[in-house]
Amino acid sequence: MRAAFGALLALSLSFTSANAADLLDQDFRRLAGDEVVNLGKAYSGKVVLVVNTASKCGNTPQYEGLEKLYQEYEDAGLVVLGFPSNDFMGQEPGTEAEIQEFCRLTYSVKFPMFEKVSVKKGNAHTFYDQLAA
């Protein structure tokens, strides 16, 4: 856990607050919902960890660690944002409703989850292209 937090801190230092504000000024729909959230407005002043997720891969158990990290540091200003993606060997094939149910029932995920997106270079959502730049 300490290593993950250290890596997060190191990554966060590579962005200035102006870069982060520009990057986060994007709208995403909540997973399996209609509510649209502007990340910049909703998470201004927070340390933001963005993760692409999949429910049927070897790393799926990381939901548990991500939720623990979120619960432990939420009051200190950390937010974990999950973005399901089916880009890697079809490991997130379900509907958004199925993904949401799986995350809640299997790992008690409470950190914010957003619409299913493409994260792979070439087809990536603009947000992920900007993260990779």
Regions picked out by a protein language model, each given a short descriptive name:
Residues 15-20:
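Sec/Tat signal peptide C-region and signal peptidase I cleavage site
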Residues 59-126:
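Structural microenvironment flanking redox-active thiols in thiol-disulfide oxidoreductases
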Residues 6-14:
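Bacterial N-terminal signal peptides
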Residues 25-27, 115, 129:
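Terminal helix/beta-alpha structural elements that buttress the NAD(P)+-binding lobe
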Residues 26-47, 68-73:
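A short beta-strand-turn-helix
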Residues 52-56:
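Amphipathic alpha-helical repeat scaffolds
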Residues 1-4:
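Positively charged n-region of N-terminal signal peptides that target proteins for export
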Residues 48-51, 81:
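Conserved hydrophobic packing residues within short motifs/helices of P-loop NTPase cores
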